[in-house]
Amino acid sequence: MPEIRIAALDLDGTLLSRENTVTPATRQAIADAVARGVVVLPATGRALANLPPLVAQLPGVRYAITSNGAAVWDLGTDPLGAVYSRYSDAETRQTSEPACLVRRLFPVEKAREVFGLYQEFEGSLSVFSDGRVIRDHLAQERMGNHQRRLLSLSTEAKQPNDGRFHIVRDTAEWMSRHAHEIEKFCMFFENAEAAEAALPRFYALEGVEVVQGSPDNIEVTAKGVDKGSALLALADRLGIPRAQTLAVGDSENDRAMLEKAGVAAVMANGMPQIKALADLVTTADCDHDGVAEVFETLGL
């Protein structure tokens, strides 16, 4: 296999264990790869504001792909400080803020069309904009344990409008003023069956990308927006050819990244159809140093 110069890591089920931790061996493997000059970055469906602190604090992490590829960020030399700076109150804001290198938003009319379709279903709808998660009070009330777990990773203590996610009175009213700023839509349904029943309606939309981060959700970005295209855009910006890019993932929302990267690695806990895309499938899962195994196998 070619020398790897940039490695994009999915979070849930890949970099993060089921207990939402990074194993010591994986942390060390990342530090060693960075010391050798490899660019290692998270590639997530989350908004920048909800990037877990333990990920932002990984050794040498400077860049992040967020919102399923709708944005690519340069977090500078203090990633955690940069994220907190951008989404903190003005009184506590630092001078260093993350720079958005790539941002690919919905065309206004397409954003309105997608939002209109989501309104036909009951669930917890979040709108991703400018690195934040926007939802209204009804969506917040519908939010189940899965979504609460995801939000809990953004910070240990927070208030509803601390900047990392923003609760508005009415999402439709907010959309009337911000339809030109949308990175991604994401709805969590009551269960996987409800999401599966709704999927055909979303697949019928033109000019969008539809993925599932989990069986009970549906996520939509603009056409051509995915983790894979974001990885290649960053690699091109850094002068790294596609052949020297690595993607590591486990689920359907990693498909485009795995298909487009020069080398694709899938975790032992990955979905069978995703393992079929891999150049390398680990013997270890996300709880047992799977990412470290990838790095060791590829000599990173």
Question: Where are the regions that the model predicts?
Answer:
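Conserved acidic, metal-coordinating active-site core of Asp-based
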Residues: 117, 121-124, 128-248
